[in-house]
Structure formats: C-alpha cells, structure tokens
Amino acid sequence: FFATSIQADGWIPNITIGGNNGDEDYTAYGATFLFTPNDRFEALLTVESMDDQSALKAYNQNFNVAPGVIAPPPPGPNTTDFSGGLLACTIYPQACRTSPDQLGYAENDTQHDASVKTDAITLNMSYELNDNLTVKYIFGYRDVTEDRIYDYDGSAAPFITLERWNVYDQTSHEIQLNGSYNNVEFTAGLYMFEKEFEQDWATG
C-alpha cells in the first residue's frame, strides 16, 4: 500500500481577490498485489487513484502594459511596436501594468481553480514456457477527468477567461513472446490501444 499527500499555501500574493495564487492540494493512494502460485507464473496488479485540486500556477502576470512601459523596437520590417501601450489599458486604466520589472504579486480577478482526478489499473502477468521462452501480458487502464479555469489576461480587468472540461479514458493490451537462445534474444507480440476523449471548452 502507498499514499502521498501534498498540501501547501500559494506562493504569490493576489492583490485583486486576496489570498495567494498557486496553492497545492494533492492526494494519491494505491495498492500493489503480487501473485506467484508457482515458479513459472507471476502476476503483479497495481490499483491507484490520484486527486489533484491544486490551483494553476500559470498566468500570474499582467501583460496589459500602459504607454511607455515597453520601449520602441529597433527599426525593421517585421517588428511590432507596443510602446504606446495596449488597448486594454484604454478601457480599464486601473488594470494597467506600469513597470516592466518582474512583479512580486498577481492581479488576476478570477481564481485559477483546477481539478484533475485519475483512476488507474495496471496488470503485468508472465509465464515461463520453458528455459528459453516467456509469455507476458500487460494491461493498462486510465480514467481522467479534468476541470480548470484560467484568467487568461492575468489582470484585474474582466477580460478573457478559459474554462476546460475534459474526460479521457484509455485502455491498452499487450501480449509478448520473449525468447533467449545463447547469443540471440527477441521480443514479438501484439499491442492494442484504445482511447476516448471528450472536450468541452468555454471562453468568457
């Protein structure tokens, strides 16, 4: 049996909604079972579950800069000049970034909530046919559900948010024939992989 738990407060203060960005809340647990009825056969089964409710650590910086924050680029045919500031600062001047320095705080007005849950099953079975040949079967299953929201612009202004809901199922089967004869070793087999993915994204 194994288990892991990680709990931590956020690491960067948020001056718009309070608290800190980047808190961690992760738990995982599982068990492994070994079955060896004789010297030729072995089965190893692992069942585990992971639950990650940690907030997203990305998109912590506001890049809606005011006029004069970014210097004009050198002359050239493929340059973009942001020295006049961004349009967002005209609409929401209170949400403008006024310094090019790395900020010691976050300004996003939407908390970066996230949830990722994973259930997993792995099975390995092997049987020795003789001293030279071994048959092996490997099974894997993953069930993942994900829900997260980003404050994409990272500012105090009510601009772009992106919310994602994903559901992912994966199943795999593998059969191997492993051989070893003097100086020759080989592996032959079949592999099947099946997955199903559902995605629902919304912007606001």
Task: Label every PLM stretch briefly.
Residues 1-12, 16-75, 117-123, 169, ...:
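Transmembrane beta-barrel wall of Gram-negative outer-membrane proteins
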Residues 35-40, 80, 130, 137:
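Short, structured coil/loop segments at alpha-helix boundaries
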Residues 42-102, 107-116, 158-166, 195-204:
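Flexible loop and strand-edge segments within Gram-negative outer membrane beta-barrel domains
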Residues 110-111, 122-124:
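Generic recognition of flexible, low-complexity loop/linker segments
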